[in-house]
UniProtKB/Swiss-Prot annotation:
PROSITE patterns registered for this protein in UniProt: PGM_PMM (PS00710)
EC number: 5.4.2.10
Function: Catalyzes the conversion of glucosamine-6-phosphate to glucosamine-1-phosphate.
Cofactor(s), names only, from the UniProt record: Mg(2+)
Cofactor note: Binds 1 Mg(2+) ion per subunit.
A single Gene Ontology CC term: cytosol
GO process terms (BP): carbohydrate metabolic process; peptidoglycan biosynthetic process; UDP-N-acetylglucosamine biosynthetic process
Name of the protein in question: Phosphoglucosamine mutase
SUPFAM superfamilies: Phosphoglucomutase, C-terminal domain, Phosphoglucomutase, first 3 domains
Length: 446
């Protein structure tokens, strides 16, 4: 059965445009509450990032859940992985995140966690979708859900993050710049690193509801690069708006992406005999990551793009680490979902154990030139990926690369975009092919 509302990462869109409206969120809260109550008594955690519309949608979800008889625990602004963790530790039936991740403030969305802190099973998502098409009812007033607020949520999560670092290890003498993207990590991330001994300069930690991800964070890393250089910091850490993505900047100002961070973590586990299997990347992972892991005899597999698919592959194989070049990094030895703070801590630990700088550690992975171009296709009824001209051009490029690279065309799961990616050993050739393919995709979408 195809989904009407749920995409690869929940439900997302422009605030005020269906389904990102208060009336839909009320109905969604009710439908979710009814679905979760079928599992027994129901308690649901609700958290959000810092965008202004989160208050409106929090109230709507709260009302819908209560109408279905579900008790609601409000967390306030918290990183997405914190909501997964707290859902687990409170033994709740589910957790709900109000966030549009790295998108601007005028977008918002909803995603769910199961009681185990993992993405919601497909059958529960489908049950919620079916209930959304049914008339809304209200349980007897004696069975309405109660609502309360967890006032120590941030402190609980800070202590959890710190517990991933051995008590014998600290980060004294380490000079960090941390960019919180005016998002959900603005309180907890600086506290975690400072309490572990690091000297921390904080950027973009003054959310006003409108400035989340605005020219800051992991999608706009220029100000972090400048701050690292000006402050002579050892490295910089950039989070996205909901705290599930992380990128870094070394002391020279060079960007260290998710592929490189994943390699540093995996190599550290491998050297200590704790890797447990291999590494999961995605179709977008740089070929250089695959080759660097191969040099260490570490197995590597590619999942579909999206942290839920990385997580599913890890669970199926019983492996521990995986991630995306965008900065989603999953460490199953600590978490049940991508957690930017946990991933950053594991990188810092790996550097400490080896006595390396971040700039030195990233040299072990030689990335292949890769060009990614996003093409917006709007309301076009043409499927560009199935268009004969696009298929033929893609095949020609693959043939021209002669086994020295690869081509990937795919639709974004969260935005109306086609992502055109070409990768190979010749940067000029890669860019020429990517630009030609992107131009063709744009033409057939008109």
């Amino acid at each position: 059965m195809s989904r009407k509302y749920f995409g690869t990462d929940g439900i997302r869109g422009r605030v005020g445009e269906y389904p990102i409206t208060p009336d839909f969120m009320l109905k969604l809260g009710w439908a979710a509450g009814m679905a979760f109550r079928k599992q027994g008594n129901c308690r649901v955690l609700v958290g959000k990032d810092t965008r202004i519309s989160g208050y409106m949608f929090e109230s709507a979800l709260e009302a819908g859940l209560s109408a279905a008889g579900a008790d609601v625990l409000l967390l306030g602004p918290m990183p997405t992985p914190a909501i997964a963790y707290l859902t687990r530790t409170f033994h709740a039936e589910a957790g709900i995140v109000i966030s549009a991740s790295h998108n601007p403030h005028d977008d918002n969305g909803i995603k769910f966690f199961s009681g185990q802190g993992t993405k919601l099973p497909d059958e529960i998502e489908l049950m919620i979708e079916e209930l959304l098409d049914q008339p809304m009812t209200v349980v007897d007033s004696s069975k309405l859900g109660k609502v309360s607020r967890i006032n120590d949520a941030a402190g609980r999560y800070i202590e959890f993050c710190k517990s991933s670092v051995p008590t014998s290890t600290g980060f004294e003498g380490l000079k960090l710049v941390v960019d919180c993207a005016h998002g959900a990590t603005y309180k907890v991330a600086p506290s975690v690193f400072r309490e572990l001994g690091a000297e921390v300069t904080v950027l973009h930690a003054q959310p006003d509801g409108l400035n989340i991800n605005e020219n800051c964070g992991s999608t706009h890393i220029e100000s972090l690069q400048a701050a690292v250089l000006v402050g002579h910091a050892d490295l910089g850490i950039a989070f996205d708006g909901d705290g599930d993505r992380v990128l870094m900047v070394d002391h020279t100002g060079a960007i260290v992406d998710g592929d490189e961070l994943l390699f540093i973590i995996a190599r550290d586990l491998h050297e200590r005999g704790k890797l447990q299997g291999g590494v999961v990347g995605t179709l977008m992972s740089n070929l250089g990551l695959e080759l660097a892991l191969k040099d260490l005899d570490i197995p590597f597999v590619r999942a579909k793009v999206g942290d839920r698919y990385v997580m599913a592959e890890l669970l199926e194989r019983g492996w521990l680490v995986g991630g995306e070049n965008s900065g989603h990094v999953v460490c199953c030895n600590h978490t049940t979902t991508g957690d930017a703070i946990i991933a950053a801590l594991q990188v810092l630990l790996a550097l400490r154990r080896r006595g390396e700088t971040l700039a030195q550690a990233r040299q072990a992975l030689r990335k292949c030139p890769q060009v990614l171009i996003n093409v917006r296709f709007g309301a076009s009824k043409v499927d560009p990926l199935e268009h004969p001209a696009v298929k033929e051009a893609s095949a020609r490029v693959t043939e021209d690369m002669a086994g020295r690279g690869r081509v990937l065309l795919r639709k974004s799961g969260t935005e109306p975009l086609v992502r055109v990616m070409v990768e190979g050993d010749d940067e000029n050739q890669v860019r020429t092919h990517a630009e030609a393919l992107a131009k063709l995709v744009a033409e057939v979408c008109v």
